[in-house]
Amino acid sequence: IYKIVDANGGITRQQYNGYQELEVTVNPEGYTRKTSYNEFGQPVRITDENGEDTFLSYDGNRNLVLLCTPGGKQLSWDYDEMDRVVSRTTLSGETVKYTYEGGVLHTITDGQGRVYTLTFNDRYDLELLRFPNGLFRRWEYDGRGRLIQAVDVKGNATRYAYDRADNLIRLEEPDGNVHRFEYDAMGNMVHATDNIREVKFTYGALGVLKSREQERHRITFGYNSELQLRRIGNEAGDNYFFELDGLGQVVTEIGFDGLRREYERDGAGRVTRVNRPGNKWTEYLYDGLDNILKEEQYDGEVSLYTYDKDGMLVKAENSENLLEFTRDRKTGQIIEEKQGEYTVNRTYDSEGNCTRITSNLGADIRHTYDREGNLQTMQVGESWQASWIRDNTGLEVQRTFSGGVTVRTERDCFGREVRKSVRSGGIEKGAYRYQWGIANHLLSKENELTGTVTRYDYDRFDFLIRQETMQGSETDVIYRMPDFVGNLFETPDKKDRKYGAGGKLLEDPDCFYHYDDEGNLIFREFKQLQETGVKFDRKRMEKERGIRCLATGMGWLYEWSSNGMLKKVIRPDGRPVEFRYDALGRRTAKLYFGKVTRWVWDGNVPIHEWGYKVTNMQPDEEESAPPKEPTEDITTWVFEAGTFVPTAKIQDGKQYSIVSDYLGTPIQMYDELGNKTWDCTLDIYGKVTNFEGSSLNECPFRYQGQYADEETELYYNRFRYYSPQKGGYISKDPIGLNGGEKLYNYVYDPNSWIDEYGLVRNGHLAGNKHPITGVPFDSNGFPDFSNYLYSKGKNDVMITPTGNRDLDFKAANAKAGYTETPKGYTWHHHQDKGRMQLVETEIHAKTGHTGGFSLH
């Protein structure tokens, strides 16, 4: 085949050598990929679409022994006389060794000398995996090789049963929850139940999913004659439409609320322009490897991105800031990030764990890890430190902070926290007890020191719907009741709020809500006049914003930048609050009432925060240079390594230790002498219900990833803003249906799930199936692609993750023995760090999920 003409007229040209080996491929956009081969037909040089070379070397038995990336990173392998891998060298230079017994893999020894032992049965099914610390996991199979029992390291057993067609018909979880499944003659699941839920499915031609029904809540799916998804109908009967081109690519998307977006694509299928409502647009420019080089908005706002030879980001720039990244030559990990004039440096060990973070603003944070790779100590300079004691599974059982503060954690057999005790100076300053039910539902929480008991109720969709708090003779009840499509109400009869199509909150007892043509909240209008409020020019506001006031014309105004980030909030008193962001969407500044609050970031968490009056800006010595901003009274925030959980605050030479609950939500703060300075309790909306301390804003963090802005009554949640008053976001999910069909919602159960980025994840799918693809999700909310793996070769390998998809894919292909990813498949980053699975591309793309790439 030398020429391929696709349905859109795009032409792909292919050129072969004399041995019919594909040497050159030119895609419809003119980008060329070249491959050179040795005398055995093995690729030895691959030139990618950017003109960069990857080199591969083989031994005399034709085994791949070396892969060298365009940026000079290397992976290598050694083999025994039977051509089995006996060692591999990772990007960091560590050597992983393998031994075999009876023809199967027996031990894996990592670069730290930790030995993992594997035992297989006569059918080559894995029966036992023994970890370096002596713990083990077990699997049992029936005579047909089907898994019938899996036992975790704590002895918890999950049991499986099948019908004669090998369909899973029963799954019994360790907590007693029993799942039952029924299938039609084609092997499609039509009925699924457990101790809580019941779900029914219907199918069309060739097994395409037509509907999913739970408790009379029905979601439907429509297809074209090619069985390509064209429509999703939600529980209220609203439809989400897709218009496709000849290649099945989405070119028009019409949301549940009628909002329309059109996508222009180049010959390679890449989106080059998004035509948005209101004559707004966004254009994209790419390199040969599909990395975005330029993003331009309709108002002229531009973001620019630069990559190294391996396709890893090294520079990002917008009108507000220039970001520059220096990466480790071997691993590609970021070792220095420049954010304008501020610099953050990172040091790593050979396993990729961060061991030190420093900055030119004075941060010096050190981490150490135990033999199993778990965080063991953290230290800030010579002033503050924390240490961890863990059980043999790596779960925390005790944490000790500076000032003699000790946090002890008790857990049940599933690893869930059942009691947390905080002691300082030998006195218990906090004591919390938790009771859990099946499906990881938190049933109750007790503050043992105050006697306050809070009980929780859930519906059959895993929504947290009710909180009942009892203290003495007083009882307080808060409702969080969803309707058919997941819109939340604060009363059992669900009459206190009104919603529009697509989940827009239109009215509550106090306000009317107005939105722009992209679904962003632009005015929260008070129903009653406020004494401190400023009345806006009603006619002018209605004309400029395209709305019609329904009451007082007073309230909160919101303005949005062209890339969808909140730009300004005008308070009811008329004072504006303005925001600035870098090219990665991280908030770098807040301006309010003559004061600037600034942030410097360490990855996705803030490391420094400080404020100054605008009048304090000092001009540079050169008149043409912009004034230098003051950097005084800096607060350094310390987060538990690799998480969004704050652990310390360093300010004005003082150190404060932060205690968080099981979910990572801050609940207490102590000074360096062990005195409690801050104590906070949230309700099921994330609103503060009880507080002790001098200022609530002394610790502004709420749910993981959220920063409370007292000026706006909103929580900044990385890519969006969360309103604790409404229990949801004030703009749509920017990742669309990939975050679920509830585009304004926070997670279903905020007692068990978090949304660190403001991009709703898959917690609500835990224990269920994806509504579009039917892919099952485990109890932790991760997809199980076992039924959609590549069947003609290796489909599950371990690599050292680099943080770059293309580089990870190359490593996975090399490990699996492929010169390129098999057509129709893609590599999925499993939640287990470094594990890659070869999965059907279409299934992977349509199964909106959070995978290992986001986590690690």
Give the role of each language-model region.
Residues 760-826, 830-856:
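Nuclease and nuclease-like effector domains acting on nucleic acids or nucleotide cofactors
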Residues 39, 517, 562, 583, ...:
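A cytosolic small-molecule/anion-sensing beta-strand core signal
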Residues 658, 668, 702, 745, ...:
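Structural recognition of the beta-strand scaffold that forms the well-ordered cores
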Residues 434, 484, 494-500, 648-718, ...:
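A motif-centric feature for acidic-aromatic and gly/ser/thr-rich catalytic loops and repeats
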Residues 524, 668-669, 687-689, 720-730, ...:
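Short, low-complexity export/processing leader segments characterized by acidic and small residues
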Residues 1-498, 503-508, 512-515, 519-533, ...:
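Extended charged/polar low-complexity repeat regions
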Residues 519, 664-666, 682, 721-722, ...:
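Cysteine-centered, disulfide-bonded loop motifs in secreted/extracellular proteins
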Residues 543-555, 624-632, 815-821:
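Intrinsically disordered, low-complexity acidic Ser/Thr-rich regulatory segments
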